From Swiss-Prot:
It is found in: Nucleus; Nucleus speckle. SUPFAM superfamilies: ARM repeat. Keywords: mRNA processing, mRNA splicing, Nucleus, Spliceosome. This is Pre-mRNA-splicing factor CWC22 homolog. Residues 169-352 form the MIF4G domain. GO terms for biological process: mRNA splicing, via spliceosome. Residues 1-11 have a biased composition (Polar residues).
């Protein structure tokens, strides 16, 4: 044991001697300590062992899926060891340098110079680093940052632009992180104070980062983007492009969380009309094309947020998506949890997405006309413009800042004008109060403003009052409290009608409101009457939807008797006075009235005797053409029951016209006779008056010779006037007589010509009928005789060749002679019958003519009846057989059938006679 210990000690002493080289001798003790610490520190050895251990593992490729985390931990541990060693080394060195034993003047001077150089280098670094570093450097308080910016005189310099960029980045990031439903309007105002055109990359990055960190506030960020997009569409487009790229990146990497956040943001942007619905349908199609559990989960989350909007704008697309989900549920092998998610999605759709509205309450902040929708497909290539996230020097920095200030002022002034209508109304009231000024004499002068400048805000207040009311009574109360002057009552009524017309569908609220105003004051009722006439005259200017709403509102006013039915006086139904728009208005108007009142009540109202003068244009009876047009119109719109009286009038119109003509003729004839008698009496009276006047003149001349010449001249003038009036009346009476005589002569000639033409037609028809009968009868007989001869000849040759007698031949000869004699008698009877018929017709015609000339003053209907009776008599006297059979046959077809049957019987009898004659002929006997 001792020998071993001595050997170890000896070996260690020997090693010490070898290690103590001249180089070690030249080094100072402090340097040797440092060398020893560096070479023999256990931390260094430990670090080298660990690194060697890591290298061995890297050679074996022993890393699993968590290798990145292991590397991260090892790097952190290595950094920690290095920092610890550096601190330990610095501590020891300071300790040795500060010891008085080892301090030398030369070394102290060297060390002092080194420390001074290090301090100056640190100061230089501190001057450069705070702002120009990559991450922005250390935190600089805002006051100090403003002071630093004020110290820089050149605002186009790199340092100033860098400072403003850092301030812009911090303010945008802070505002985006603070936004919520309650303060979004204030945040928008503060954001617009910053130059978001220059920092659009920073803004889009901040919004996407904030949404990814807190997806529960996605609807708030979507509303923020929608407001910014309405003023700066390029910023909204940039955010949407980056969202699409994030979704595609997450889909490629199978990053479910990134897909969920980005798809949810896209859904809310579509609800705010920033993104188009085609993008959403493409994303859903991509997710469900090759379904997995994660892709189905992302699709269902996306559908919950955008399903209600897609149902409205693209029902076919959403139906296809749900059909695909149903197919996946039934056919695919998916996890039970995902199956439950699909079933829940169908339940949400069945409930109408009531828990997932399109835009939550308080976030519908963009007007429809200000919205800007971007049509960006999913598969296109987009540039995310990441350069905008990094600072870049702008050579025209101050010019761009001034441009943005002008743009900001314009946007903020516009927003203030839209958000403060009440302030404008208040200022207008103040201006009205200031209109009352005083003269220099102290008298008060009232200035009336007739420029109607205040009419526009009053229209705005009316519209706001109407739209903010829950029911019509509250609205009427609000409008009456505004104290409109009488000159603006019609304007108020027009405003109510315009609000009703602008609705998508008719709302009964406006009809009830207008009815309430009509019941309150007569002026409102008269205003609505005038508006009805104006609207009907200019109905062609309205669109179909507005026309329908206006018609339904006026129908409500008429049904409730808020305005009188006399307003229908302006409606004239005819082909010339109506247009397509007016016919549509009348159609909707009366259909609404029939729906309110019912067809019987409406018909009774239209038949009201007191209102008939106002319905003359609506139900015209002046012209059969207009009457027929009105009947066809009401029948085509399903209200034919209103035209029963018009139909009766149209049926009886010819009769009424004839009776009116007859009355006119009789009145003309009576007036002519009266005028004759009056003319005779006038002539007698004129002669007697002339005689009396002459006698009076003579007496006056004899008695009073002192009459003045003026009175004589007056008398002469009056006499001349009387004579001229008598002549004019006589001429008129003569003209009337001549016209009446011409009319009566024409009518007589027309009646004669009509009767003659009718009688000639009847004669011709009868002659042609008799000729046809005779010719057909003879043709039948000849044909039958030829056929019978041939058939009898064959029959006789076969069966009766040996049976013939002379007696039969003689009988047949005599029978043939008798038959010829009968035929000649028939022809004579026919000729005699036709002559008798002609004579009877002439006699009846002469009787008819004498009767017609005798009863000339009877009506037109009596003449037609007598003419028809005489025609029937003449026709009935045509043949005795027809007189006997007339009580049996009423139809002409039956008479013809009997006639043909009679001819067929004659044909059979003649055939039998011919057969017998041929059989018993002497030629056959031979």
């Amino acid at each position: 044991m001792k020998s071993r210990v001595t050997q170890i000690n000896h070996g260690s002493n020997h090693e010490r001697k070898e290690r103590y080289s001249p180089r070690h001798r030249s080094l100072t003790p402090e340097d040797r300590d440092v060398e020893r610490d560096r070479s023999r520190s256990p931390r260094r050895r430990r670090y080298s062992d660990d690194s060697r251990y890591d290298q061995e593992y890297s050679r074996r490729e022993y890393y699993d899926d968590r290798s990145s985390e292991g590397r991260r931990m090892e790097r952190g541990r290595d950094r920690y060891y290095e920092k610890w060693e550096e601190r330990d080394y610095d501590r020891r060195r300071k300790r040795r340098l500060s010891s008085p034993d080892h301090r030398s003047p030369e070394r102290s001077t060297v060390q002092g110079s080194n420390t001074h150089e290090e301090a100056t280098s640190k100061k230089k670094k501190e001057e450069v680093d705070p702002i120009l570093t990559r991450t922005g450097g250390a935190y600089i308080p805002p006051a100090k940052l403003r002071m630093m910016q004020e110290q820089i005189t050149d605002k186009n310099s790199l340092a100033y632009q860098r400072m403003s960029w850092e301030a812009l980045k911090k303010s945008i990031n802070g505002l985006v992180n603070k936004v919520n439903v309650s303060n979004i309007e204030n945040i928008i105002h503060e954001l617009l104070q910053e130059n978001i055109v220059r920092g659009r990359g920073l803004l889009s990055r901040s919004i996407l980062q904030a949404q990814g960190a807190s997806p529960i506030f996605t609807h708030v960020y979507a509303a923020l983007v929608a407001i910014i997009n309405s003023k700066f569409p390029n910023i909204g487009e940039l955010i949407l492009k980056r969202l699409i790229l994030n979704f595609r990146k997450g889909y490629r990497r199978n990053d479910k969380q990134l897909c969920l956040t980005s798809s949810k943001f896209v859904a809310h942007l579509m609800n705010q009309n920033v993104a188009h619905e085609v993008l959403c349908l493409e994303m859903l199609t991509l997710l469900l094309e090759r379904p997995t559990d994660d892709s189905i989960e992302v699709a269902i989350g996306f559908l919950k947020e955008s399903g209600l909007k897609l149902t409205e704008v693209s029902p076919r697309g959403i139906n296809a998506i749900f059909d695909r989900l149903r197919h996946i549920l039934h056919e695919s092998k998916i996890d039970m949890r995902v199956q439950y998610m699909i079933e829940v999605m169908f339940a949400v759709r069945k409930d109408g997405f009531k828990d997932h509205p399109i835009i939550p309450e308080g976030l519908d902040l963009v007007e429809e006309e200000d919205q800007f929708t971007h049509m960006l497909p999913l598969e296109d290539e987009y540039n995310p413009e990441d350069v905008l996230n990094v600072f870049k020097m702008d050579p025209n920095f101050m010019e761009n800042e001034e441009k943005y200030k002008a743009l900001k002022k314009e946007i903020l002034d516009e927003g203030d004008s839209e958000s403060e209508p009440d302030q404008e109304a208040g200022s207008s009231d103040e201006e009205e109060e200031e209109d009352e000024e005083e003269d220099e004499d102290g008298q008060k002068v009232t200035v009336h403003d007739k420029t109607e400048i205040n009419l526009v805000p009053s229209v705005g207040t009316i519209y706001l009052a109407i739209q903010s009311s829950l029911d019509f009574e509250e609205c009427a109360h609000k409008l009456l409290k505004m104290d409109f002057p009488e000159s603006q009552t019609k304007e108020l009524c027009n405003m109510i009608l315009d609000c009703c017309a602008q609705q998508r569908t008719y709302e009964k609220f406006f009809g009830l409101l207008a009815g309430r105003f009509c019941m309150l004051k007569k002026e409102y009722m008269e205003s609505f009457e005038a508006i009805f006439k104006e609207q009907y005259d200019t109905i062609h200017r309205l669109e179909t939807n507005k026309l329908r709403n206006v018609a339904k509102m006026f129908a409500h006013l008429l049904y409730t008797d808020s305005i009188p039915w006399s307003v229908l006086e302006c409606i004239i139904l005819s082909e010339e006075t109506t247009t397509s728009s007016s016919r549509i208005f009348v159609k909707i108007f009366f259909q609404e009235l029939s729906e309110y009142m019912g067809l019987p009540n409406l018909n009774a109202r239209l038949k009201d005797i007191t209102l008939q003068p106002f319905f003359e244009g609506l139900l015209p009876r002046d012209n059969p053409r207009n009457t027929r047009f009105a009947i066809n119109f009401f029948t085509s719109i399903g209200l034919g029951g209103l035209t029963d009286e018009l139909r009766e009038h149209l049926k009886n119109a010819p009769k009424m016209i004839m009776t009116q003509k007859q009355d006119v003729e009789s009145s003309d004839s009576s007036s002519s006779s009266e005028t004759d008698s009056s003319s005779d009496s006038d002539s007698d009276s004129s002669s007697s008056s002339s005689e009396s006047s002459s006698s009076s003149d003579s007496s006056s001349s004899s008695s009073d010779s002192s009459d003045s010449d003026a009175s004589k001249a007056k008398k002469r003038r009056t006499q001349k006037k009387n004579r001229e009036s008598d002549k004019a009346s006589r001429k008129k009476q003569e003209k009337k007589r001549k016209s009446l005589e011409k009319k009566t002569g024409r009518r007589r000639q027309e009646d004669r010509s009509d009767s003659e033409s009718k009688s000639e037609r009847n004669h011709r028809n009868l002659r042609e009928a008799h000729r046809r009968d005779d010719t057909s009868k003879y043709h039948h007989r000849d044909e039958s005789n030829g056929r019978d001869d041939y058939e009898a000849y064959r029959r006789d040759d076969v069966s009766k060749y040996h049976q013939r007698d002379e007696s039969n031949g003689r009988d047949n000869y005599h029978s043939g002679r008798d038959r010829d004699h009968e035929r000649s008698k028939d022809l004579e009877n026919k000729h005699s019958n036709s002559k008798l018929k002609k004579a009877e017709r002439r006699a009846s015609f002469s009787d008819d003519e004498s009767y017609r000339h005798g009863s000339r003053d009877n009506g037109h209907r009596s003449r037609k009846r007598e003419r028809s009776k005489s025609g029937e008599r003449s026709y009935n006297k045509s043949s005795p057989r027809e007189e006997e059979d007339d009580h049996r046959y009423r139809n002409g077809s039956e008479r013809l059938r009997e006639k043909y049957n009679h001819y067929s019987d004659q044909y059979r009898e003649s055939r039998k006679h011919e057969d017998r004659r041929r059989e018993n002929s002497p030629h056959r006997r031979k």
